[in-house]
Amino acid sequence: VVYAPTEPAEARLLGGQVATMHEGRITQCGPVADVYRAPADLRTALVFSDPPINVAQVHKRGEQIELPGAASWPVPSALRSRADGPLQLGLRPHHVRRPGAGGVAVRGPVLISELSGSESVVHFDVAGTTWVSLRPGVQDYAVGETADFELDVAQALYFDTDGRRLSS
């Protein structure tokens, strides 16, 4: 039996095997958890994240990954042999955490804070890119307030400029 939901959330809830498609072609197939944890490309990562995955342009320069105008961190071992240049970073909202959680510090003005059940979805700007943080409980941020966050870059997904996932 094949069930073809149009909503990615339904596919995630059904579990089992899943196939993702784009323009009539299968882009990835496998167990739901595997596709979620290791999406083959940026399009799959975007579809399989709710709230949507944060995507930012970063640069590999020597032994550092740079988020221009905001932060830098050591290059993951799997990307060390890759030539310097632009990459796309994917980081799910629950990996953008409160300060003191042990990640890469970023700060920026809050654009909006929404309550979603027992969690808050906080949208904020870092160097011209909108980021989303999924935080437990009710977070009371005023629009325009400068807020501090930490990126759990150990959980980051890296993609080339064409959107293909790189080992990380």
PLM segments and residue spans:
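Residues located in well-ordered beta-strands
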Residues: 31, 43, 57-59, 109-111
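Conserved ABC ATPase "signature" C-loop
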Residues: 23-25
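Conserved catalytic segment of ABC-fold P-loop ATPases
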Residues: 14-20
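Non-catalytic connector elements of ABC transporters
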Residues: 51-55, 63-168
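Short acidic-hydrophobic catalytic motif
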Residues: 33-37, 45
